Structures are given as structure tokens and as C-alpha cells.
């Protein structure tokens, strides 16, 4: 999944003062799609699946970090990404981080959303109460050894583990008609 809301630019603020990035991690423009990272991983890769997921041992029930239930792996009680597993913090510095579920809920609740096309790729223009905005491109997601859904849907990770199954984490998912927070399998990029 693309990582967007990384608090890079001091231009976009929602109601409680969270500052959002104006571009995806790994790019210097709002239009390219950015890089794809599995949840909690800090490197891009060529294949995305349980067999290549670094926070587990090859299956959804052998997680080695961020696990709340023993049926999914080694329980550690960690619910949100630590700074050593937050690609935004590692890349941009300690004041930067992947948004939490709460941050994304605020984006959904306090901002206006409008479908927009940039360089042939649709996405959503998200405008805050101060009139400033970010563009979330429909960048698709990586699974197996390919990226699918470019121009069809977008998925943007939060830093928050999904309560109903430690093999998932929350992400903002959207298509041309809906946008919502959902739990999704952690190995997707």
C-alpha cells in the first residue's frame, strides 16, 4: 500500500492539529504513486506475501511482532507501530510517522472528499477545514510479485493493528465511490 499521510509538509492540518504530508513517501511530487511497503516493514521488495513478510515466519499465524492473540503468533501486546518499524520515522526523522487509525478517522470526519484525476490516475482531493488539501492517488496495492489496481483503488496504511485479527492492520481503502477504514492483511504492499 502506498504511504501518504506522513506529516512531511506543514501545509495541511485537520481539526485537532495533525499535519499531513502532501505527497507519498519516496517521491517529490503529488502525482507519482510512491513506494509500496508491507505493514511494519521498512524496505520495498519484489514480492509481497506471508513467505516474504519480515514480521512473521511464513504464515498468518506465525507472527513474531505486533501480535495480540496466540492463535496468530508470539503475543507481545504491541498495538501500534514502534518507531523502528515506521518507515516515515526512519526516512524523515522522529517528528514524522505513519498516521494512526485515530488520525485517519479524523481525516474521514473533518475533511471534504472530492474525486479528482491527476495525470490520468483518479484519486480523492481531501480538503481540511483550513482550505488546504492533499491528493490521495488510486495507487493500487502490491501482492505477490505485482502491483494491481492502479487507477482503480487506493489503500493507505495506518500504524494501528486491527483488533479482530493480528494478521491485519487498519488502512484507508477507497475506490471512485467510497472511502473507509478497514482491516487488511499486513503483507500487502
Q: Residues of each region from the PLM?
A:
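Conserved positions within compact, well-structured domain cores
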Residues: 2-189
